[in-house]
A protein has these predicted regions:
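Short, well-ordered beta-strand core segments
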Residues: 27, 107, 157-160
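Extreme N-terminal starter segment of soluble prokaryotic enzymes
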Residues: 1-3
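Walker A/P-loop
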Residues: 14
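ATP-binding Walker
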Residues: 11
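ATP-dependent small-molecule kinase phosphotransfer cores
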Residues: 26-99, 134-138
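Conserved phosphate-donor/acceptor-positioning beta-strand/loop module used by diverse small-molecule
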Residues: 86-87, 100-125
Length: 183
């Protein structure tokens, strides 16, 4: 089983992935591919340099390049109980993964209102997160420009994540339970 987790920043993708990891899934993150390529190229890694690097990578090799590279990793990691892919950033990526990994592929969209995501971002205080509403809106604009929201229409499951962390964990466990029942 391969579960692709998508959503806007602070929608709960990483927390959802943690639940899957606790249930034996191997979690792979799209951003890790970009970070490794940047490291190999000797490029310093921060949010802005990652955006610039990934944008130039997509222009040079196609919008689905990160997905194609991820597909190779997934094929190498097939021994796991399941695989969770976190952080799809556009329609070409989800379509490429569906095509390349046709068996047992499930796309999950984390649905969370912008005001809730902004509050979460302020609370988590990651080094590369914007620290004000203006910065948050700029980041939203960049994500939308990449087509992150377009991934939603390809979701097999939409999980509303506007409650507590415990609520999200319950939703994740319920989904895993349903998948195990249908397997």
């Amino acid at each position: 089983m391969i579960i692709c987790i998508s959503g806007m920043p602070c929608s709960g993708k990483d927390e959802f992935s943690k639940v899957l990891a606790a249930k034996g899934f191997k979690v792979l993150r799209m951003r890790d591919i970009i970070k490794e390529m940047m490291d190999d190229a000797g490029v310093s890694i921060d949010r802005e340099s990652m955006r610039t690097f990934s944008t130039s990578l997509r222009k040079k090799y196609g919008d689905d390049i990160v997905a194609r590279l991820m597909a190779k990793r997934i094929k190498a990691a097939r021994m796991s109980k399941g695989i969770a892919i976190c952080g799809i950033r556009g329609e070409p990526e989800v379509l490429a993964l569906k095509k390349l990994l046709d068996d047992s592929f499930l796309s999950v969209w984390m649905e969370t209102r912008a005001d809730i995501r902004f509050k979460r971002m302020m609370k988590r205080k990651r080094k590369d997160d914007p620290m004000d509403l203006k910065g948050f809106r700029k980041r939203e604009s960049i994500e939308k420009g990449w087509g992150t929201e377009s991934v939603r229409k390809h979701a097999d499951v939409i999980i509303s994540n506007e409650g507590s962390l415990a609520d999200l964990r319950k939703s994740a466990l319920l989904l895993i339970s349903r998948l195990n029942t249908n397997a």
